[in-house]
UniProtKB/Swiss-Prot annotation:
Subunit structure: The basal body constitutes a major portion of the flagellar organelle and consists of four rings (L,P,S, and M) mounted on a central rod.
Record protein name field: Flagellar P-ring protein
Record key words, sorted: Bacterial flagellum, Periplasm, Signal
GO biological process: one example: bacterial-type flagellum-dependent cell motility
Domain of life the protein comes from: Bacteria
A Gene Ontology molecular function term of the record: structural molecule activity
Gene Ontology cellular component annotations, sorted alphabetically: bacterial-type flagellum basal body, distal rod, P ring; outer membrane-bounded periplasmic space
Record gene name: flgI
Residue ranges of coiled coil: none
Keyword Secreted belongs to the record: no
Positions of disulphide bridges: none
Main location as per UniProt: periplasm
Species in which this protein is naturally found: Fervidobacterium nodosum (strain ATCC 35602 / DSM 5306 / Rt17-B1)
Biological role: Assembles around the rod to form the L-ring and probably protects the motor/basal body from shearing forces during rotation.
């Protein structure tokens, strides 16, 4: 319906139905084993090859002079007046079970007053773990994304002092992990939920025909390793990962007022209500067919079909949440 028609007083009655359902998801897609986790690495390095967009001041000159001494080249810091280098922080995440020789993606960010890292090359930089040990070494050309285009709002928001080096770090040391605790393993849900934890234990017990799994709380499920797998734990873990569990999608509405977007997931129900907003008077009436109910998804679809703007929809959703008729969490960004 055209926007000019919306200038008229509208009375809308919506009778909306939606089935309640859960999605079957493999355990490996919504959980992980305790002990198998990423670790953060960090280091401080120098990006060179910048075309006058590097750091100013004497800090860089001192660092470069010290670095050159390691190669047997003695240079007075006062003679190194260059803006072609920048001091950067280098960070990376190392996944579990990564072996020496495997590669990691790396991010770099300017520490000082560099204008851009574009076309620069990161010199060899050791990456440390929280324990102070070196686990990887990073080096390579820095990418800061596409070229800035004059007049483009999106591209003007680029940050050329933050860069990325795909597979820019080489793992030098493996981080030790321990998954098995005695004769059991613990599954950790990525998002704690009592219902999903209980269903996970039930699905595992059903798969193996015995009560080997027990939900400890909303985030963890303890699984005893059957004797038949005592010498082949990896095969047992692989079987666990492939078990499908009916997982409820969390009822949540996320609003980004800057971009005018509304994101919603799960079976988000809404109670009966009457709302007057601008030129709209909206009445929601739930049907009485089994366990079906009105949902926010159908409400938003109906509003869009009537020509409501993103700002209109955001305002309506916020008012309904304040009134307590939306059965979901609301996050505003």
């Amino acid at each position: 319906m055209r926007r000019n028609i919306l200038s008229m007083f509208l009375f809308i009655t919506l009778i909306i139905y939606s089935s309640i359902f859960a999605v079957n998801v493999r355990i490996k897609d919504f959980a992980k084993f305790r002990g198998a986790r990423d670790n953060q690495l960090f280091g401080v390095g120098i990006v060179v090859g910048l075309n006058g967009t590097g750091d100013s001041g004497t800090l860089n000159s001192t660092l470069l002079s010290n670095m050159l001494k390691n190669f047997g080249v003695a240079v007075n810091p006062n003679d190194l007046k260059t803006k072609n280098a920048a001091l950067v922080m280098v960070v990376a995440d190392i996944p579990p079970f990564y072996k020496p020789g495997m590669r990691l993606d790396v991010e770099v960010a300017s520490i000082n007053d560099a204008k851009s890292l574009r076309n620069g090359i990161l010199l060899q930089t050791p990456l440390y773990g929280a324990d102070g040990n070196v686990y990887a070494v990073a080096q390579g050309p820095v990418s800061v994304g596409g070229e800035d285009v004059k007049g483009s709002v999106n591209l003007q928001k680029r940050f050329p002092v933050v860069g990325y080096i795909p597979e820019g770090a080489l793992v030098e040391r493996e981080i030790p992990f321990s998954i098995v605790d005695g004769n059991s393993v613990t599954i950790l849900l990525n998002k704690p939920d009592f219902t999903t934890a209980a269903r996970t234990a039930l699905a595992i017990n059903t798969k193996f025909g015995t009560n080997i799994a027990k939900a400890l709380d909303g985030a963890s499920v303890k699984v005893n390793i059957p004797n038949v797998f005592s010498d082949d734990v990896i095969s047992f873990l692989a079987l666990l990962e492939e078990i499908e569990v009916p997982v409820d999608v969390v009822a949540q509405v996320v609003i980004n007022e800057r971009t005018g977007t509304v994101v919603f997931g799960g079976d988000i129900g809404i109670a009966d209500f009457v709302l007057s907003y601008g030129n709209f008077v909206i009445t929601i009436s739930n049907g009485q067919i089994g366990d079906k109910k009105a949902t926010i998804g159908n409400l938003i679809t109906a509003l869009k079909s009537l020509g409501a703007t993103p700002q209109d929809i955001i305002a309506v959703v916020q008012e309904l949440y304040k009134a307590g008729v939306i059965f979901a969490q609301l996050k505003i960004m």
